[in-house]
């Protein structure tokens, strides 16, 4: 097992050519004294980014509910009895209107999500039109459409997509407790297709799903050992929804969430680390510590797919208090 000091020194090189991080390495980092860990992460953050700048993304569900997957955290699954109602796919005009509003609010990236295992060809053609129109507005484009088949990533790239999101969700050893309908390797296969097509990768996970600290270390290791590392790493704090299997999960202590952000920054120094789901349940002080620990991106807007998010006015107020500026 490497000492925490040795692990910290290794972090100076972003996007390693070979996988170097071990679960023991990352667990040692997560166990550092809290103030020391945040300080180290803040130092690394400043080597690669302006700490006063935050990237703003808006996420919209273009097709809600009716998903055949059984992800234990998700209210859109047909396997769970939740308040989320199925909705048809949005029209291109509806998506463009949402993108215009996001841009007017200050977002620089517009993300589109769809609840299905993966896009059928007919659905993909509709999403290609959405990507083209959103790109024409001058926004960065991102999509999270599930598992991709051969050639689909290339079509999205040709339409103007910048980022493709496909999260690993949790550590490999924990994965079977959360999802049964898709394998971990399925996720890695889609990430490989995305890279091969020349798209930037957005890939992160969820904490607060009854996992151990070592499980969180295992997730970070999987992300940090991707070659190259993801350009964007969303870190979600579980939003518990009535009717999902993870309703009633033990809530993650706020210090553990900040530790997770800090270690994501140390192990992936050149990636954007995004505060994603769960921010509405965090107080401003916790969010401020996350920014200090290296978070430099947020989802911006009052809704994330089907769960709540701080409204634009609240986020503008927080950023003003912290002297943060949008990228």
From Swiss-Prot:
Checking InterPro entries in the record gives: Aldolase_TIM, BATS_dom, Biotin_synth/BioAB, Biotin_synthase, Elp3/MiaA/NifB-like_rSAM, rSAM
- Biological role: Catalyzes the conversion of dethiobiotin (DTB) to biotin by the insertion of a sulfur atom into dethiobiotin via a radical-based mechanism.
Q: Which superkingdom is the protein from?
A: Bacteria
Query: Sorted alphabetically, which keywords does the UniProt record give?
Result: 2Fe-2S, 4Fe-4S, Biotin biosynthesis, Iron, Iron-sulfur, Metal-binding, S-adenosyl-L-methionine, Transferase
What processes does the entry annotate via GO biological process terms?
biotin biosynthetic process
Query: Which reactions are catalysed by this chain?
Result: (4R,5S)-dethiobiotin + (sulfur carrier)-SH + 2 reduced [2Fe-2S]-[ferredoxin] + 2 S-adenosyl-L-methionine = (sulfur carrier)-H + biotin + 2 5'-deoxyadenosine + 2 L-methionine + 2 oxidized [2Fe-2S]-[ferredoxin]
Residues forming the Radical SAM core domain are 52-279
Q: What is the organism field in this record?
A: Chromobacterium violaceum (strain ATCC 12472 / DSM 30191 / JCM 1249 / CCUG 213 / NBRC 12614 / NCIMB 9131 / NCTC 9757 / MK)
Kindly list the positions annotated as binding [4Fe-4S] cluster. Answer: 67, 71, 74
For [2Fe-2S] cluster, which residues are the binding ones? 111, 142, 202, 274
> Which cofactors is this protein said to need?
[4Fe-4S] cluster; [2Fe-2S] cluster
NCBIfam families noted in UniProt: bioB
Q: What's the protein here called?
A: Biotin synthase
- EC numbers: 2.8.1.6
Keyword check for S-adenosyl-L-methionine: yes
Q: How does it assemble?
A: Homodimer.
């Amino acid at each position: 097992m490497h000492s925490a000091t040795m692990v910290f020194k290794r972090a100076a090189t972003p996007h390693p050519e070979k996988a170097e991080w071990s679960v023991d390495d990352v667990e040692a980092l997560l166990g550092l004294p809290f103030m020391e860990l945040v300080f180290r992460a803040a130092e690394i953050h400043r080597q690669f980014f302006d700490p006063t700048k935050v990237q703003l993304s808006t996420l919209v569900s273009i097709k809600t509910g009716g998903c055949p997957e059984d992800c234990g955290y998700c209210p859109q699954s047909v396997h769970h009895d939740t308040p989320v109602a199925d909705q048809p796919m949005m029209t291109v005009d509806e998506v463009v209107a949402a993108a215009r509003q996001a841009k007017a609010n200050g977002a620089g990236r517009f993300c589109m999500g769809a609840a299905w295992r993966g896009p059928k060809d007919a659905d993909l053609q509709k999403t290609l039109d959405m990507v083209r129109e959103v790109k024409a507005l001058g926004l960065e484009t991102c999509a999270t459409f599930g598992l991709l088949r051969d050639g689909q990533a290339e079509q999205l790239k040709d339409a103007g997509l910048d980022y493709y999101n496909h999260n690993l969700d949790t550590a490999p050893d924990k994965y079977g407790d959360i999802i049964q309908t898709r394998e971990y390797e399925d996720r890695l296969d889609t990430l490989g297709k995305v890279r091969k097509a020349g798209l930037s990768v957005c890939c992160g996970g969820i904490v607060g799903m009854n996992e151990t600290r070592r499980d969180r270390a295992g997730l970070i290791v999987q992300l940090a050992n991707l070659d190259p590392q993801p350009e964007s790493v969303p870190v979600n704090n579980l939003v518990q929804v009535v009717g999902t299997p993870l309703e009633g999960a033990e809530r993650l202590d706020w210090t553990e969430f900040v530790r997770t952000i800090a270690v994501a920054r140390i192990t992936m120094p050149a990636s954007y680390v995004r505060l994603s789901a769960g921010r509405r349940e965090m107080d401003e002080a916790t969010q401020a510590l996350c920014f200090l620990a290296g978070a430099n991106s947020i989802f911006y807007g009052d809704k994330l797919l089907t769960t709540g998010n701080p409204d634009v006015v609240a986020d503008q107020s927080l950023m003003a208090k912290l002297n943060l500026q949008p990228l």
